[in-house]
A protein has these predicted regions:
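Extended beta-strand/beta-hairpin segments
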Residues: 1-97, 110-207
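Alpha-helical metal-binding/catalytic segments enriched in His/Glu/Asp
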Residues: 103-104
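Conserved phosphate/anionic-ligand binding catalytic regions in large, soluble enzymes, centered on
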Residues: 107
Length: 207
């Protein structure tokens, strides 16, 4: 696996679609309907639909629409030289971290309001740790994730036990916690030119 020290200079002699487009890495879209993209069905109370495509080796572009707010955003991601990327946008796992801490913040504030606990200057500092061993080119790469560290800093009149209990319950109430705790069976579907390609090693989505 290449490291930062022995990787070639970023972008030398390679096309960089994200920079060439001249667009911001993230921006809000006025209307997803104008792009011919339909909102998802509301099956579980909070529905999000994502349309994504690959731009180059590691660059991805996505349009994300939330049924709850109707908001649509264009997002983009890239990787660094250690994965043969161009470092033109945040890596995909950065979006996971941002979504997690945002969800925790929302749940903490909602629970505090319900319990009439005043939160002043609430700050969450979250560290996510990921591992990567082996070579992507050789097909031996294995990725992993270590436990998340969440540090809560707040000025409040609540005692330590009440605050600790509130944060613990808020984290468990977060949708992302429901995604991370149980073991899931991977589902994957690969489609080329409208035809599904058999992948063999994992269960197909929808089956």
């Amino acid at each position: 696996m290449a490291t930062h020290g022995d990787a070639p200079p970023i972008g030398r002699g390679r096309e960089n679609p994200l920079l060439r487009s001249g667009l911001p890495i993230f921006f809000r879209i006025e209307s997803a309907n104008g792009l011919g993209l339909a909102l998802p069905e509301n099956r579980h109370g909070q529905s999000v639909r994502v349309w994504a495509r690959s731009l180059t080796t590691m660059q991805k572009e996505a349009i994300v629409v939330s049924l709850g707010s109707g908001a649509a955003w264009r997002l983009a991601s890239d990787e660094g030289p250690y994965l043969d990327g161009l470092d033109a946008a945040p890596c995909p796992l950065a979006f996971m971290t941002t979504g997690m801490v945002s969800s925790y913040m929302h749940e903490i504030l909602a629970l505090a309001e319900g319990r009439d606990i005043t939160m002043r200057n609430l700050v969450l500092v979250q560290d996510n740790f990921y591992t990567m061993v082996g070579s992507a080119l050789r097909g031996t790469m294995t990725g992993g994730a270590l436990p998340v560290a969440l540090d809560v800093r707040v000025d409040t009149d609540a005692d330590d036990d009440a605050l600790r209990g509130l944060v613990t319950e808020a984290v468990r109430a977060s949708p992302v916690d429901g995604l991370l705790r149980p073991r899931h069976t991977s589902l994957f579907t690969l489609t080329a030119n409208g035809d599904e390609c058999r992948v063999g090693r994992v269960a197909s989505l929808g089956r």
